[in-house]
Amino acid sequence: KNAINPELVAGGSSGGSAVNVAKEYTVFSIGGDTGGSVRQPAGYNKIYGLKPTYGRISRYGLMAYASSTDCVGPLAKSIEDIRIVLNVMSGKDTKDQTSITSTEISEKSISNNTVKTVGYFKNFIESEAINPQIKADFKATIEKIKAKGIEVKELDFFQSDILVSTYYTLAMAETASNLSRLDGTNYGNRIEAENLKETYAVTRSENFSEETKRRIVGGNQVLSQGFSDEIYLKGLAIRDQIAENFKKDFEEVDIILSPVTPNNPPKIGDSLKDPLAMYLSDAYTVGFSLGQLPTLTAPQGTATGLQITAAKNNEELVLQFANFLKELI
């Protein structure tokens, strides 16, 4: 249940982590963010949540969902706690070959704002799908930023439906591959049946949730013969275009600002009735995941917060700007 309104969802999949922090059961918590699963719950529960640069924090010990975008990130009520936990968790790990070395972020380095230019995606804000109040609140935040002498630029980006479909095409394909080992032979809870084939079927049918099974079936479909070239490989090509788009954007701006979600948190149970609506709630988070960029949810600016994104390996600038926004809004 949401920490602020128990009739609303806490967000997923790290909703429990976010609620624990929001209710002050813990000083910080750790979540997994593949397409927004740290950032969305952080926004829904009005705390900070960071998805770091892909590879900055080791994924060793994390159950793999979509390996190309899986990240581990901290959630906390203060920017300083985010900084401390990030420093402790960051670094190269021999048990995760995708992990990278990184420099420690000092308290002093994030105390003064050095951001000169901020960008935002016009199509996110002008979308018909965005809640009018979130749109109005975001625009008001932009005006406050301009009033402080920071240049703000409108940026072009991929449409939300393309981002969501690309993300779920790749994520489902990787999910089908990653979870294929959970058949009860070496991994997973085994449920015996009359023969081996039925044992596999019952084990996977009973142990996976409906949503997990939906994603596995979707992943197997896009990887199957006749679909792979048309769907999966096209998804990979679009992901490369997204990364190139971000590279050009960060030649023009220091930070990209966006809402975390286009709408307010739904009531408990509503998302299960409409899986498509649930997927579309990720419209503003998945693009940054595909770009493997550092992105922080800050609990200001709109009903579900603001996303602050910088170029790869620039978490310091993200935290800097979060401190600036905290004082501004």
Question: Whereabouts are the PLM-identified features?
Answer:
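Charged, often glycine-rich, active-site loop that binds/positions anionic groups
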Residues: 165-178
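Structural helix-boundary/capping segments
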Residues: 23-28, 34-128, 139-148, 217-245, ...
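General small-molecule cofactor/ligand-binding pocket signal
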Residues: 151-156, 296
